Amino acid sequence: MKATLIIKNIESLYTCDKDFTVYKHAFIACHHDKIIDLGVHDYKKWIDSATRVLDACGETVIPAFIDCNFEGFSKVRLGDQLRENNSALYAMKTNGILTILSDKKRIQKKELTQDVFVRKQESKYPIIEREQDFHELKPQKFIVSCGFGKPNSYVYSFQHLSYILFNMYKVDLRTLLESMTSLPAKTFGLSDRGSLEKDKLADILILQVPTMEHYYQTLGRPLIHRMIKNGIPFYPNWIVC
């Protein structure tokens, strides 16, 4: 078995595994929708003539984001709900949120570039949607959500809230990154995603920054260079693997 996709020369690879392993100058290899290898050793054994290779020199690689509390539009006609919800989900996808959980069954869908699942349980951790939520609770562990669909809330990205939590409230990097990747995956039974490990889904973001500290210290500039869902790069353009 050879890799269908390899990302090489990664400046910082945040796996979000149980030990929060971070590799420098690393690679990640995927076979179709699954990760088959990653680390700092030689990746050439995984390459054949059909392998697509992406160069992430100077860039950061992390698991794709997960939002566990999408409510969507409810106080409009059904046809308008479907249209507006699809538009909102697309906007969230462009900001790296490739898995979404909702308690609204009508929103459920699974497609090549984004999964929307029905949330079947409540979170044992606080869900932080606004600065005020964190200010009031000051939790040690939490899950971040855009809170889309709440009254007067049309937020499509984690970037603004994560900037505030990292820079104003001094939330440590591991807690913050896990709150939008591995912790929601673990909490809601999404055992196939949320971290970059062997046999996990290849849902991956490549960011135009050398470290996640740079990402959380930046606001107002798009930083996602590439997005990969189920091992297929689809943003900024499709690459067949």
Predicted regions and their residues:
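N-terminal metal-binding scaffold of metallo-dependent hydrolase/deaminase domains
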Residues: 1-47, 211-214
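Divalent metal-coordination and catalytic microenvironments
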Residues: 10, 28, 33, 58, ...
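C-terminal cap of metal-dependent C-N hydrolases
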Residues: 14, 198-241
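Short loop/helix-cap segments at secondary-structure boundaries that form the rim of catalytic
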Residues: 41-49, 107-110, 123-124, 134-138
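Hydrophobic faces of well-ordered beta-strands that scaffold small-molecule active sites
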Residues: 64-70, 100-102, 114-120, 126-129, ...
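Active-site loop-helix segments enriched in His/Asp/Glu that coordinate
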Residues: 79-123
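His/Asp/Glu-enriched, well-ordered alpha-helical/loop segment
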Residues: 135-206
